[in-house]
Amino acid sequence: MKKILVAFDGTVFSEGALEYAFHLSQNGSAMITGVFIEDLSYVGYATLFGEDYFTFNSTLLEKMEHEDDRKLSESTEKFEQICRERGVAYEVHLDKGVPVNELVRESLFADLIIIGYRTFFSNVMGEASFLKDMLIDAQCPVMAVPDHFEPIESLLLSFDGKPPSVYAIKQFTQLFAELPAKLPVTLLSITKTKEETLEYEQLMREYLTVHYLHISYETFAGEAEDAILNVAEQLKNPLIIMGAFGRNAVSRFFSRSAASKLLKNQSLPIFVSHR
């Protein structure tokens, strides 16, 4: 992996997201690009300042632009200072527009995007909306991470027996070639019923034994989000690899109940990839 994007908005500097980027940059060999997006959505501005959208006026817009410019300057300076202190190669991209659209565009030319859970979550679409849209539309894998950094000490790979889940697990394994040898790995096989067997499970296990040294296996019959959360609670500082989910399932995962469980906790980093 050679290029990691870390997404920031004009109001929230996620130090946790940057720390995860350092942690995953494979001994500093990856370029870390800070993408700072000035949200030009009027709805986002109005919500940020507690104003009614329909009373939005030019004076307020000027006030907000000035405040955003100040915060953006502070954030970029902080990012550059931290990267220099760590001796990490970095770039700064300053984008203006709708955050989801800008990051999807940037994702075409990146190996991974890291987003703090609270980044861009001040809009009226609700906490899960931005993250859900990114997970569905991004052109590279996305990691959503807590504000407080904890070193990753285990991996939880989710698997449903379908080719998309194999693709995501393989992509994670190839991106983070050094992690498998160091960390304990749990393969979570998820079925709809206890009687169901998963296609390709034996081949999946065979693949993992080539790449991972310390592997354990769990099976769960039921809803995917319940399986992930239940098993993750038993692991030490896990990174969740949502390899079992394609575009439609990502959308289902971020239903109101499932999203509130994950975002309220905000302590579980997740890696999501799809074709």
Report residues per predicted region.
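Charged docking surfaces used in two-component/phosphorelay signaling
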Residues: 94-101, 220-225
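A short helix-to-beta-strand connector/capping loop
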Residues: 83-91, 211-216
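N-terminal membrane-insertion helices
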Residues: 68, 72-76, 197, 201
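Ordered, amphipathic secondary-structure segments that act as subunit-interaction surfaces
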Residues: 71-78, 82-88
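Gly/Ser-rich helix-loop-strand patches that form or flank binding pockets
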Residues: 14, 92, 100-149, 232-275
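CheY-like receiver
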Residues: 24, 82, 102-106, 227, ...
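A short acidic, glycine-rich active-site loop
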Residues: 55-73
